[in-house]
From Swiss-Prot:
Gene name of the record: thiG
Record family assignment: Belongs to the ThiG family.
Pfam families to which the protein is assigned, alphabetical: ThiG
Catalytic residues identified in the record: K111
Provenance organism: Rhodopirellula baltica (strain DSM 10527 / NCIMB 13988 / SH1)
Statement: the UniProt record of this protein carries the keyword Transferase: yes
Family annotation (CDD domains): ThiG
Name this protein carries in UniProt: Thiazole synthase
Disulfide bonding pattern of the chain: none
Enzyme kind, highest EC tier: transferase
Predominant cellular place of this UniProt entry's protein: cytoplasm
Residue numbers spanned by region Disordered: 268-287
Function comment: Catalyzes the rearrangement of 1-deoxy-D-xylulose 5-phosphate (DXP) to produce the thiazole phosphate moiety of thiamine. Sulfur is provided by the thiocarboxylate moiety of the carrier protein ThiS. In vitro, sulfur can be provided by H(2)S.
Amino acid sequence: MSTDALSDSPLKIGSHTLTSRLLVGTGRYDTMEQMRDSLDASGTECVTVAVRRERLYERTGQNILDFIDSDRYILLPNTAGCYTAADAVRAANLGREILRTLGNPGSDWVKLEVLGDSKTLLPDPVETVAACEQLAADGFSVLCYTSDCPVTAQRLKKVGAAAVMPAGSPIGSGAGILNPANLQIILEYLKEDDEDYPVIIDAGVGTASDVSVAMELGADGVLLNTAIAHAREPVRMAHAMRMAVDAGRHAALAGRIPKRLYGTASSPQEGVISTRPYGSQADEIGS
């Protein structure tokens, strides 16, 4: 098989189809120019933007839309900073109106975040489920940030989430994938009756190997921000993340070999020049 034959199906979320499985945030960069260049290096097609009262903006007060090519990227408004379902619904509707004005196709979806704790930035499961149900009823394709709790993930899918996005670890922590077992359970449960249902790992990624691990577990994509924005060289890290998501995806599709306690020779044993005792014989010789 040639490398040209290693094709992959696109990632479908609601009405959107993406060939890149890396979704990238736009906050916390030193400069807007750095953000712009990092997005380009990442190869992403979808960028998340925080919604505020009057505009989509970054902490410097600059309008982020001046540095994002809305013809190139699908914008994904997010409700970052909301602590109640009501606030999240308001933010989502504001984002929808802004993107409709821009004519960007991202006006029909939203990344839902409803936080429950300002220190850990972990989500409030009750408010998240309530907001997801309301937004789905209002016609949004809802991508839900949640914890690694399989029960909450199931409830979000049941109330209409277009994608469930469990955290690898707390937002911005860089701690990586702390509970792979729970993520595997979430993947099993949510894909049981629909293997194409999108599960995207969101939050906690620290470096490229974390992205590969997430993809090797079977995730459909990874959403990240701080791991690029706070890297020593953000543009270089963005490029690393681009390669990592592809490497992890191909590894998942290819299938890893089983883990074994003992070694297994990769070279044929027939006709070897010398033999070496195994097991108890080796122990006797050693004594």
